[in-house]
Amino acid sequence: MIRLLFLLLSFYISSQTDQNSKEHTLVLEIPNIETAGIIYIAVYDNAEDFDSGDDSREIMAYNIIEPVSKEIYQKKIILKEGDYAVKVLIDTNNNGDIDLNFFGLPKEQFGFSNNVLGLFGAPKFDKASFKLNENKKIIIKLR
């Protein structure tokens, strides 16, 4: 009897673990790249890291850095089920920085998931986040 209970408990725990680690395909599409450069995509899975302003790769759930041309950009990535928010920057002069104009606004194209903007800077996670609980495609329009 104890063996049967142990076996049932083990099966239940393993089935819960499988449900919590479901993976889905996220397709990121960026349709309006105006100038070729290096694309920086940062995917975050929590508000603390997204809202921190810290762009170190260690705190990102996923990141992409690669050359991009003036075409529609699409990338498929596999992520665990959960809530995510995405930041995108096109570095057109390849200096690794967000270049700002006199008013402190970015000179280079940028965007966020849900196509939201913050009032004075990046939007908060709760505005930019989306739930990934099935395969999904999101379109981020750059500004």
Q: Which residues does each predicted region cover?
A:
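Bacterial Sec-dependent N-terminal signal peptides
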Residues: 1-22
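Primarily secretory-pathway and cell-envelope proteins
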Residues: 16-47, 53-55, 100-143
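Surface-exposed loops/turns
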Residues: 35, 80-82
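Hydrophobic beta-strand positions
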Residues: 43, 89-91
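Tryptophan-paired
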Residues: 54-78
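A short tyrosine-centered beta-strand micro-motif
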Residues: 82-88
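Acidic, glycine-anchored loop motifs typical of Ca2+
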Residues: 91-99
